[in-house]
Amino acid sequence: MDDLNYATLTDALEQTVFENFDDGLYIGMMSGTSLDGMDAVLCQFSEKDNTQQPMHVLATHSQDFPPRLREVLLALCQPNGIQALTPSDDEPNSELDWFGWASKEYAEFSSDVVNTLLQQSNTDSESVLAIGCHGQTVRHRPQMGFSLQLVDANIIAERTGISVVSDFRRRDMAVGGQGAPLVPAFHQALFAVPDSTRVLLNLGGIANIAVLPAISNDLVDSNEHSENQPSDSVVGYDTGPANLLLDAWTTLHTDKDYDAGGTWAQSGQVVEPLLNQLLEHPFFKKTYPKSTGREDFNLAWLQDELQKFDQASADVRYSSADVQATLTELTAISASAQINLFINASSSNAVYVCGGGALNNYLMTRLQVHLQRCKVETTASLGLEPTWVEAVAFAWLARQTLMGETGNLPAVTGASKGVVLGQVCFA
């Protein structure tokens, strides 16, 4: 590229994107492994905000997936899962075609969610700098060096009139990382404080933790902490399954999509020998950094484990509610065991929970039982409702991308270096 063309491109970028960072509006979008719908937030970041919270959520919107799209997404998440679909005359008949169909449908649905959010908040699309759209993970294979998030950002940019940042994970993987978890970098930027270590526990489809060490007072005084590149001293990784298995088992045995408040699980009894068997999964023996997903923990895996258990323990009787209680305990024990590694050696006295699992009262109670050294509460006590944390995180990651700042934490993902994440599709 010659100097003239490069200068022209640089000027265009500065005029269209790299401006008004101090008070920029961003939209973050997230649909997790639990596939319960799309969350979207409109938020404002400010480098000039000297408060403890240089981010403000202005509006939120959540919308369930159309039933057919959700069905196809769930099928795509499973190897050969698409074979269970019965296509109509105008629908695809191969897995690759279904992937393209779902990518388009997902993007059109995402566009509708964004436009509804803009309408409800009376916000002009021209005032929004970018959308951070994670897309839907249909395959995460860090051991093979790839992760696939399904979304067509071109459609979203065209239908909303807003530039879109997507495909966040693969740049981290290009430098040797696992591409996950990415949210701990945001946790560090927003929630770290100078006087104590904090632990953030995200309970989405998969559970993951972020251990945030106390930041230096020099950074706090200079107001560099929240907006500069996050520190590699953060520890973060996936700890195991959460809502993914809980929701799948609930859907299979009840007429509900999820166990509201954990009341069904609470009505059952933990099957200790089954719990011990589930904890033998190889993932729990791995050291961090590590990540997992539906490829490791899914309904087929659970049913296979139950079959093995029944064959080995024919005299043990249990109900479907007992299995739900056991799955809840699996999440609580696998997460708390990792958190306790850091609580015991730190000054932290609180674990802040976010994600849909934060609304599961029974799970929160079980976490508190296993985390006796600290108080378990939600991120609402830090000023951000737990169900919106991940969506805000991807708004923040989009902002990092447009600012040319790194968005990954090598100590968390295992990458060889910090890199600017994502690809930008301009409106």
Curated annotation (Swiss-Prot):
The keyword Nucleotide-binding applies. Its EC number is 2.7.1.170. It comes from the Bacteria. InterPro entries: Anhydro_N_Ac-Mur_kinase, ATPase_NBD. Belongs to the anhydro-N-acetylmuramic acid kinase family. One of its GO terms (molecular function) is phosphotransferase activity, alcohol group as acceptor. This is Anhydro-N-acetylmuramic acid kinase. Catalyzes the specific phosphorylation of 1,6-anhydro-N-acetylmuramic acid (anhMurNAc) with the simultaneous cleavage of the 1,6-anhydro ring, generating MurNAc-6-P. Is required for the utilization of anhMurNAc either imported from the medium or derived from its own cell wall murein, and thus plays a role in cell wall recycling. It catalyses: 1,6-anhydro-N-acetyl-beta-muramate + ATP + H2O = N-acetyl-D-muramate 6-phosphate + ADP + H(+). GO terms for biological process: 1,6-anhydro-N-acetyl-beta-muramic acid catabolic process; amino sugar metabolic process; peptidoglycan turnover. CDD domains: ASKHA_NBD_ANMK. Pfam families: AnmK. Disulfide bonds: none annotated. It comes from Psychrobacter cryohalolentis (strain ATCC BAA-1226 / DSM 17306 / VKM B-2378 / K5). Keywords: ATP-binding, Carbohydrate metabolism, Kinase, Nucleotide-binding, Transferase. HAMAP family: AnhMurNAc_kinase. ATP binds at G32, T33, S34, L35, D36, G37, M38, D39. It is an enzyme of class 2 (transferase). Pathway: Amino-sugar metabolism; 1,6-anhydro-N-acetylmuramate degradation; Cell wall biogenesis; peptidoglycan recycling.
